[in-house]
């Protein structure tokens, strides 16, 4: 039963681009995307604060669901829509502070054991990955594939879920067919020959999410 310890999110979050700059946040919001994540890696809080502030302001202007990856203190300070954390970040994060601030929480998982850990935290949504091989980041685990993804989605049938990892435009329909509520994409948009067209096509497949 979906009873998160954090504010809920729509069951279907739709197309969910993960990008590393405010410029991409603004472009994608302007293109009609309504769920997205700012993921800037390996910088100190003070180095990314201006970008976090700008991204949150854009998210508010477009009435979008903007998640901040990892920088949970800044997300709380500037009242982001939500925070996304990897498994390795859960132990080092003050989840009570995120909850008290009224922010949504998304958590990454890579197998059944990590899903158990995520469920214990009762987040707003659970990300399932990586579905396919990915060049975006180094992954210690093997790709799950569509069958494993479908099994996880079935297990979490009443929970908002996000598929991530190596999802291209060509693979997106098969991923959505598993019943997952959202697809997170990175290079499918940022490395596309025509990012506007790729975004429009992915929105056609995954939607903008439920209100």
From Swiss-Prot:
Catalytic activity: 2-[(2R,5Z)-2-carboxy-4-methylthiazol-5(2H)-ylidene]ethyl phosphate + 4-amino-2-methyl-5-(diphosphooxymethyl)pyrimidine + 2 H(+) = thiamine phosphate + CO2 + diphosphate; 2-(2-carboxy-4-methylthiazol-5-yl)ethyl phosphate + 4-amino-2-methyl-5-(diphosphooxymethyl)pyrimidine + 2 H(+) = thiamine phosphate + CO2 + diphosphate; 4-methyl-5-(2-phosphooxyethyl)-thiazole + 4-amino-2-methyl-5-(diphosphooxymethyl)pyrimidine + H(+) = thiamine phosphate + diphosphate
Chain positions recorded as 4-amino-2-methyl-5-(diphosphooxymethyl)pyrimidine binding sites: 37-41, 69, 108, 137
GO biological process: thiamine biosynthetic process; thiamine diphosphate biosynthetic process
Record-listed E.C. numbers: 2.5.1.3
Keywords of this entry: Magnesium, Metal-binding, Thiamine biosynthesis, Transferase
Entry annotated with the keyword Transferase: yes
Cofactor comment text: Binds 1 Mg(2+) ion per subunit.
Signal peptide: none
Binding site for 2-[(2R,5Z)-2-carboxy-4-methylthiazol-5(2H)-ylidene]ethyl phosphate: 134-136, 166, 186-187
Molecular functions per Gene Ontology: magnesium ion binding; thiamine-phosphate diphosphorylase activity
Annotated metabolic or biological route of this protein: Cofactor biosynthesis; thiamine diphosphate biosynthesis; thiamine phosphate from 4-amino-2-methyl-5-diphosphomethylpyrimidine and 4-methyl-5-(2-phosphoethyl)-thiazole: step 1/1
A GO CC term attached to the entry: cytoplasm
Entry cofactors: Mg(2+)
Binding site for Mg(2+): 70, 89
InterPro entries in alphabetical order: Aldolase_TIM, ThiamineP_synth_sf, ThiamineP_synth_TenI, TMP_synthase
One Pfam entry name: TMP-TENI
PANTHER family xrefs: THIAMINE-PHOSPHATE PYROPHOSPHORYLASE, THIAMINE-PHOSPHATE SYNTHASE
Family classification: Belongs to the thiamine-phosphate synthase family.
Function, as annotated: Condenses 4-methyl-5-(beta-hydroxyethyl)thiazole monophosphate (THZ-P) and 2-methyl-4-amino-5-hydroxymethyl pyrimidine pyrophosphate (HMP-PP) to form thiamine monophosphate (TMP).
Matches recorded under HAMAP family: TMP_synthase
Official protein name in the record: Thiamine-phosphate synthase
């Amino acid at each position: 039963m979906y009873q998160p310890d954090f504010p809920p999110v729509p069951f279907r979050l739709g197309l969910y681009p993960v990008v590393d700059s405010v410029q991409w946040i603004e472009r994608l919001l302007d293109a009609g995307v309504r769920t997205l994540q700012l993921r800037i890696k390996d910088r100190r809080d003070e180095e990314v604060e201006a970008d976090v502030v700008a991204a949150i302001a854009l998210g508010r202007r477009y009435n979008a669901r903007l998640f901040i990856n990892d920088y949970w203190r800044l997300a709380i300070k500037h009242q982001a829509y939500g925070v996304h954390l990897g498994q390795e970040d859960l132990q080092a994060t003050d989840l009570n502070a995120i909850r008290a601030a009224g922010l949504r929480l998304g958590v990454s998982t890579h197998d059944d054991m990590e899903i158990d850990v995520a469920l214990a935290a009762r987040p707003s949504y659970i990300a399932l990955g990586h579905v396919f091989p990915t060049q975006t980041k180094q992954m210690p685990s093997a790709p799950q594939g569509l069958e494993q993804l479908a099994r996880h989605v079935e297990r979490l049938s009443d929970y908002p879920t996000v598929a991530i990892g190596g999802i291209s435009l060509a693979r997106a329909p098969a991923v959505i067919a598993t019943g997952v509520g959202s697809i997170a994409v990175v290079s499918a948009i940022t490395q596309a020959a025509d990012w506007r067209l790729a975004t429009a096509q992915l929105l056609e497949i995954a939607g903008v999410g439920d209100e």
